[in-house]
Curated annotation (Swiss-Prot):
Region (Disordered): 409-471
Summary of subunit composition and partner proteins: Homodimer.
UniProt-recorded name of the protein: 8-amino-7-oxononanoate synthase
Family: Belongs to the class-II pyridoxal-phosphate-dependent aminotransferase family. BioF subfamily.
Pathway: Cofactor biosynthesis; biotin biosynthesis
Gene3D superfamilies in alphabetical order: Aspartate Aminotransferase, domain 1 (3.90.1150.10), Type I PLP-dependent aspartate aminotransferase-like (Major domain) (3.40.640.10)
EC number(s) recorded for this UniProt protein: 2.3.1.47
Positions of pyridoxal 5'-phosphate binding: 131-132, 202, 230, 258
Organism: Burkholderia ambifaria (strain ATCC BAA-244 / DSM 16087 / CCUG 44356 / LMG 19182 / AMMD)
InterPro entries: Aminotransferase_I/II_large, AON_synthase_class-II, AONS_Archaea/Proteobacteria, AONS_Proteobacteria, PyrdxlP-dep_Trfase, PyrdxlP-dep_Trfase_major, PyrdxlP-dep_Trfase_small
Gene name as annotated: bioF
Cofactor field: pyridoxal 5'-phosphate
Gene Ontology biological process terms in this record: biotin biosynthetic process
Function noted in UniProt: Catalyzes the decarboxylative condensation of pimeloyl-[acyl-carrier protein] and L-alanine to produce 8-amino-7-oxononanoate (AON), [acyl-carrier protein], and carbon dioxide.
Amino acid sequence: MTQTAPSSLRSLPPEGAATTNLLDTLQRGLAELDAQGLRRVRRTADTACDAHMRVDGRDIVGFASNDYLGLAAHPALVAAFAEGARRYGSGSGGSHLLGGHSRAHATLEDELAGFAGGFSDAPRALYFSTGYMANLAAMTALTGKHATIFSDALNHASLIDGMRLSRANVQVYPHADMAALAALLDASDAETKLIVSDTVFSMDGDIAPLAELVALAERHGAWLVVDDAHGFGVLGPQGRGALAAAALRSPNLIYVGTLGKAAGVAGAFVIAHETVIEWMIQRARSYIFTTAAPPAVAHAVSASLKVIAGDEGDARRAHLAALIERTRALLRMTRWQPVDSHTAVQPLVIGSNDATLAAMRSLDAHGLWVPAIRPPTVPVGTSRLRVSLSAAHSFDDLARLEAALIEASEGQTRREAEQPPRSLRSLPPEGAAVSVGAARRDAEQPPRSLRSLPPEGAAASLGAARRETAA
């Protein structure tokens, strides 16, 4: 008796076909990225993150990192990291709820709540391994089908992904458009409302209208979640963040900060009313279902907070502010469009992917690492160089950047001057006019297939000749 395979198996592709199909699809996708100038390439640092580094075997000045205060290689933080590893070992051994929550984590959470929680009467902090995980937690644990999220159009990808996972209704308002946001809030009857915004927007460097956001949240009974990834440690008195810089307090606030940028280590945190944090401990999947970060990391962050809040932190912020103002001036010397940013993120919008990559390579030839930011990170047609400043930079570094940017800018001007005007680029090559005229004369002749026919009566002899040739 012949056995027939189950119908579910009969439809399976031949062995290996699924792998081949997937690889073909991915290879086509990679080729498309190459054709559009959109493939991203990793570079390998051979030394610690600093203004002057060795990358891919070359000495460079880096304008790519988010190490805004230049603390990533600070001796006090390196020593604290080593001390934490000696005390707690190299790993946490489990999730925060199953054995991985150490004294270093608990101490850091208390310190963070005291340092950046001045906006709340009852602040509590929750430490996460990454900023991405912190934003996912805030979006998913605090919302659901009953909620509406009102999101700035330029919010970070981690917030957007969290919104998608939350199952909440998401309404996007134009970037920093408070009138549009107010209209959306007026029309909403959602049980829970969350307004969500970056504080410093990572690709433009501008700062959200935080006072207006707080006022709208309070007026409409909404919560305001702010992601201060690029403000914590840099903005406000003692680097306490964007809310402290604007002197804002509200019971409606939820504050997210990261610890791998200005703080120079790794991780992130959420600060909110203690009830909000307790709920996140119970329900935030990106907190519950992952191994806790090594305690040594938390121990190093505690050392970082001391530097940030002290006299050295003030001096580093003052130097960074001076670098920012100098950079704003030098970017205006190029042919390109600088964004009006007063933060350490200084974008220079060039436009096309090809021109942006050419500018990046020109700077790289001078030993300067300034990354090209392209779609989908930024809208099509707004590809840019993003100059990220650090207190570890010197004014000599900026002088090198200025000279290289001017040369790159002039190089693009020369390349464009060497190209014919767009109206002429579609004209046929030299000599083609003759060909066109010939084509017109040819058009007046019978088709070539008819012109080559033999004289009447020659068909038989032609056929015979072909047969002889074939033989």
